[in-house]
C-alpha cells in the first residue's frame, strides 16, 4: 500500500453542537464536515477510514471502519465528495486526525493522511 497522496486534498470544518452537549456531564458534541477533492487525472474510491480522537485529558479513541457514513464513494477526476459526521468528547477541546484508505482506477491502494484538526467549544481558547 502506497502512502503517497495522488493529489487528494482534504478540507475540514468543525462545529460545536451546543444543543446536544451537556458540559455538566462532561459531554461535548462536535460535528465535522469533510470535503475530499480529487485533483488527480483519474477516479479514486474511498474504501475505509481510521480516526484517532484525543481529548484534552489525553484520552484516545481509535475508530476504524469501511467507507464514510455508510458509503464507499467514487470520486471522479477533478470532482469532490463532501460528508458530515460527528463525535463526542469528555472535554471542551480535542484533536482528530486520521487516514483514508483509497484505491485508484487500476485498483492500487494508497493512504491519504488527514492532518490533525481541533475540536473546541467557541471562545474556550485564546
UniProtKB/Swiss-Prot annotation:
Spans through the membrane: none
Pfam families: DUF525
Domain of life where this protein originates: Bacteria
Domain spans labelled ApaG: 2-126
PROSITE patterns per record: APAG (PS51087)
GO terms classed as biological process: error-free translesion synthesis
HAMAP family hit by this protein: ApaG
PANTHER family reported in the protein's UniProt record: F-BOX ONLY PROTEIN 3, POLYMERASE DELTA-INTERACTING PROTEIN 2
NCBIfam families: PRK05461.1
Protein name: Protein ApaG
Organism: Vibrio vulnificus (strain YJ016)
Taxonomic lineage from the root: Bacteria, Pseudomonadati, Pseudomonadota, Gammaproteobacteria, Vibrionales
Amino acid at each position: 500500500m502506497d502512502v503517497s497522496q495522488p493529489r487528494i486534498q482534504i478540507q475540514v470544518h468543525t462545529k460545536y453542537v451546543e444543543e446536544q452537549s451537556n458540559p455538566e456531564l462532561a459531554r461535548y458534541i462536535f460535528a465535522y464536515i469533510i470535503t475530499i477533492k480529487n485533483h488527480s487525472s483519474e477516479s479514486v474510491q474511498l474504501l475505509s477510514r481510521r480516526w484517532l480522537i484525543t481529548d484534552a485529558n489525553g484520552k484516545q479513541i481509535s475508530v476504524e471502519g469501511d467507507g464514510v457514513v455508510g458509503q464507499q464513494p467514487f470520486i471522479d477526476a477533478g470532482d469532490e465528495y463532501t460528508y458530515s459526521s460527528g463525535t463526542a468528547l469528555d472535554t471542551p477541546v480535542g484533536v482528530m486526525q486520521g487516514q483514508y484508505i483509497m484505491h485508484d482506477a487500476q485498483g492500487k491502494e494508497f493512504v491519504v493522511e488527514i492532518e490533525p484538526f481541533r475540536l473546541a467549544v467557541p471562545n474556550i481558547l485564546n
